[in-house]
Amino acid sequence: MSKLSEKEAFLFDRSIDQFEKGQYSKSLKTIQSVLKKKPKHPDSVALLGLNLCKLHDSRSALLKCGYASSIDPKSQFCWHALAIVYRETKDYNNSLKCYQNALAISPNNESLWYDAAYLQAQLGLYQPLFDNWNRLLQLDSSNLEYRLCFTLSAFLSGNYKESLEQIQYLISSCNLSPLVVSRLISFLPRICEHIENGSQTVLEILLMNQNSFLNNFNFEHIKADFAFRQKNYEESIYLYARLLIKFPNRLDYSEKYLNSLWNFYKSGGLALDLLLKRTDSLIKTFSEILQTGISVLIFLLSKNLDYDFCLNHLISYSMHHFIPSFISLLKIPLKTNDAFSKKLITMLSNFREGDSAKNIPTHKLWCTYCLCLAHYKLGDYEESNYWLNLAIDHTPTYPELFLAKAKIFLCMGEIEEALCSFKRSVELDKSDRALASKYAKYLIRMDRNEEAYIVLSKFSRFRFGGVCNYLAETECVWFLVEDGESLLRQKLYGLALKRFHSIYQIYKKWSFLKFDYFTQCAEDGEFQEYVELVEWSDNLWSSTDYLRATLGALTIYLLLFESKFNMYGNKAEEISHMSEVEQIAYAREDNKKIMKLQKIEEDKIKSYIPSESEEPLVIDEDYFGHKLLITDDPLTEAMRFLQPICWHKIKGWGFLKILSSKLYKLKGIIFCYYALTNNIEGLHQKANSLETSVL
């Protein structure tokens, strides 16, 4: 490998400088002038690849950087460049491998260790992440960012005692802002949950640093939680009461206050009559907060205590403020407690016949509507419909009444009547997006997609492909799932795959959120926020919407694997019986139709003039999903949906597991096949055969 001359080295350095300033086109031209004379200089080839990557030519960038690292496998610069290109293309596994190769050459390079930490955090490799930050801390023990990141990685990797010790050190010895100190102290209770006898230690730290809290109520919240854990219920009752006075809308405080009362009563520290007085006092004190009253009622019901006063208050308050939604909050006790259901209906009937309901029109409407909802929750649809008709006769312009009527008709199997009621509710309030979305959802479930698109178009912006692409762009997952399943039922497989792939891309985008936030959260002391992000991200691919999309995609790809003619949907059988010449002619005509429809959509874009505030409109070259259908390897495409799923987190979904096991078997992934079919014996046999072959 020849070295660069003095002039070439100068040009190489200039190209590096231009690259660091973001002048990628200039940097590219400069390095190309070097490569004209030294076409196999590895660092120059790698730099060329980096520029191509930044200029959005990732494929060429990977080829160049891969070629550079093959020319000189001992070049740290080449491996680093290849790692960056992989990282930019979000191939984090290969990027991390390249960083490891670079670190093997330059083990004391802080920049490489730092960059690798981002990848380990994204991939959930928390023990290597802990070791990584430990290494960086050894290289620069005075770096505050390194220590904060090391502390957070210690918690994530399960080294809780180390995390606790580091927080103590940070609070006592480092120059942190009051906000960061307050956040670190607030994170201590989360650590003590994992340390045996850690509560007392953490409480001592909290008391020593009480003045560090920017918000004293944050300290009292933590102190109250500690008191409850240590079964000091008298103290926790007092502290939660103080918190409720300050934050009356915090439902968790009212629930914890009630639990403290109950545990104090069970331990013999509180008489039953005092317990009931405390609950009555809670209702009276926060009489304007419906959620607090509901939580008290559910608490009294769950403990088999007298709840008449509470229920009377809730009905009276809801009647005077016309809040029928309180019935919906009682969904569980209505369905599981017959005595409560009968008492509620009796009380509502009495209020309806009372003087106040007769004198104030809205009171009568409220009572009638709530009786309808109560019977609906109990499954008595005829009685529910009777009361609802009375409410509609009283106030025929209230949209919620027609929405309730639509739901009742759906439960009774009267589909057309339900859709008419939905339509009427939307007409009464044309600006209600939520109401329109519910109507559209049921239209889609009835496979009346075009009507649903018209309803939703009133709340959409102009985009290529209309409302469907706009909702995909705005990550409206419920629409993509419902529309995809509807199109699948209609055997419009191309469009259905388009919806399911949109969901996959959305979830993939969400899964990358961890990448940028590790060091940011660590530096700001937002440990709790990052841990919550990790927990959310870990369950992302197990969500119901993604599993529904996966089930739909697998169904289509397995059909395509069975026969290529299934791509034609309802006409599959007819086309399969045609001669080869006729099939080719039909395919040609089908392609022409798709191209014509595609051109119509593109012409709409060309005639549209966007405003200055709007982003340029993007044309989808495969709007109808035709390219997704003509794949040569449908099984590999289907595997893309299965790869991120953690099956041990999924309960139920039997049909999805059956289709997945079929796919695994076809692809020869026997371990996954046996695991999904619960064939433990087959799993052991396969493992033993592999062990024997290795030996």
Curated annotation (Swiss-Prot):
The keyword Nucleus applies. GO terms for molecular function: acetyltransferase activator activity; transferase activity. It is found in: Cytoplasm; Nucleus. One of its GO terms (cellular component) is nucleus. Signal peptide: none annotated. The keyword Metal-binding does not apply. PROSITE patterns: TPR (PS50005), TPR_REGION (PS50293). TPR repeats lie at residues 8-41, 43-75, 76-109, 111-143, 145-177, 217-250, 262-296, 365-398, 399-432, 477-510. Keywords: Cytoplasm, Nucleus, Repeat, TPR repeat, Transferase. GO terms for biological process: protein maturation. Pfam families: NatA_aux_su, TPR_11. Component of the N-terminal acetyltransferase A (NatA) complex. PANTHER family: N-TERMINAL ACETYLTRANSFERASE A COMPLEX SUBUNIT-LIKE PROTEIN C418.02 (PTHR22767:SF14), N-TERMINAL ACETYLTRANSFERASE-RELATED (PTHR22767). This is N-terminal acetyltransferase A complex subunit-like protein C418.02. It comes from Schizosaccharomyces pombe (strain 972 / ATCC 24843) (Fission yeast).
